[in-house]
Amino acid sequence: MKNKPEDHQPRVVLMIALASVVLVLFLLRLVYLQVIEGNHYLEQADNTTSYRFNITAARGEIVDCYGRSLATNTTGYNLVMNNLMLGDNDLNDTLKTLVEILQTSGDSWNDATPISSPDADGHYSFTDGDNTSDQNRLAAIKTNLGLQQYATADEVMSAIVAKYELENYEPAWQRILGGIRCQMTSEDYSNYTNFTLATGISDRTVATVKERSLSLAGAEIVETSMRSYPDGTVLPHVLGSVGKILREQWVADDYALRRKGYAMNDLIGRSGLEAVYEDRLRGQDGSLQVVKDSDGVIQSSQVVEKPQPGQTVMLTVDADFQKEVQAALENRILTLQQTKPAHSGQEANAGAVVVLDVKTGGILATATYPTYDLNQYSATYSDLAAQDPSPLLNRAFNGLYTPGSSFKPAVAAAGLLNGVITPTSTVNCVNPYVYYDYRPTCLQHGHSGPIAVSDALKYSCNIFFYDTGVRTGLETYNAMAQRLGLAVQTGVEVGESTGWLTTPQDENFTSSLIVQAAIGQANTMVTPVQLATYAATIANKGVRYRTHMVAGFRDTNTGEILETVDPVVEDTIVDNVGAFDAIEQGMIGAAKYTSATSNYPYTIAVKTGSPQRAETYGTGRGRANYNNGVIVAYGPVEDPQIAIAAVVEWSGGGSNIAQIAVDVFNAYFFDQSNSLNSQAAGTLLP
């Protein structure tokens, strides 16, 4: 028998009632959430924090006159700590694990804390020594720890252990982790600032950290642009170096670097062109925005500003020619060491060569010996700093040398242009020259008796220049020397020593120094780059260009030339008496009279010098001074292209280093098959 429809009615009513109750409860809950607690949950939903991180721009390149890279960038990897990603991981334990990975791979880590590892008794010592940066760093650490500046190393380490909760680690690990934590503090590690634990890490470290990423929260492998030098032996002193910002740089001028957009762990040019053109090379950093909610969950991450690479700095230097000039200098020094007797060049051990484009003042090459490999600079700095003679000194721009007889053309120019002598007037070369009670002599090589200026330069007659110098006057020939380029700033971009001339204000001045200074002795000290500028000015018949090595700047992205550096005339000496012609004839004669340059296929102009050093050898009547060697040269005389200056310490005299000039001329004028170069060094290819 079938049920009647009315038998189902109670069930339907019950279901409707239950559904109504559920609906009412849902609506009440919705009202509660939306109306009563709405503001609370709205605030919670909006409780996110936005963080911005720098994306470092690629550094601009430095290239030679043909566009060949001298300083460039390669892709590398850094190990970075990101506090946003650390989560609940213990920072100290994470750092310990990462250091163990770095140690296994032979990688170093970022810790400049000047405190030693514990000794056998568990004591520590400071390692700051005479290093100002380390001393400043140590002072900052003590201040941060609330210690007095006289606190001992043990007291500092105790404070570090307490502050960074390192009590449960062994002493060796307390030092390692404490040093890293101090470094992190000094670099403002926080949710807003990442910390670079290690730079340029090995592939092994990269792989290991990635494999263990789940247990190493907060540790990130970051691809980065790293500075590299295709041939680190080319222009190391000039290119300079980059390094992390030092704390004293960071706090200087009320944190000026921060206002310019730097982060404390950024790289910055430390020396050379890298420092001088930091603003052009650095580029514009980009920006990464990370949004994190109140539970610490990353909600979004996006690049909001793309980084823009720095500009390319173009030089006047020809990298291949530079290598040949460097080789010419080194080979000559080694040859002198191996072939010359003691006291006559065997002791040669250091020097410099500078080669200029006569028509522009652009530096085509600048070599210093001894030198170093820029790619190994950081790793070998301590050894380099301890060597004598120092490879770190840029002798071409900062080495100060007595010019000796290479100074005589300046005295000749002063005498001729001031009417004290003429191209044909003579001085009687008879020993000794008498100036009050001072009686210097002349070696009289190849001459004696009456001699005019051109032959006096050819044979390097001392008495001619004693007399001309005295009659012209110290101040007058000094002024001429400076107009020609000696003992003044030449204009080279990376910094240079000014040097000095002998003056009446010198503490040791006596009237005899007027005589000695006229042959480039006394107190006069100049640099090789000044000597090259001086030679170029003589080649240009009195027109002195500003010496420079930067040719211009180029947009790295588009290749567009942004700026070119045009030749600048610094001085023009008016010559209505044929002074520079007479000087040139004398220097041509000197080239013919010097064995190494006597048969050169082009007509070249040369003046050597053999300035005496203060050091002596021998005893009694056999006592004598050691000599440096100096040479200035230019050529071809008919249409001068390049000017050369070379100085070699302890080389025994200018004639001993004249081969350097020959080798440099050969490298410029001829290719390796001894054929005439169709493309001269320093000439941009079309």
Describe each model-derived feature in a short phrase.
Residues 561, 662-686:
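Short, gly/Ser/Thr-rich active-site loops of penicillin-recognizing serine hydrolases
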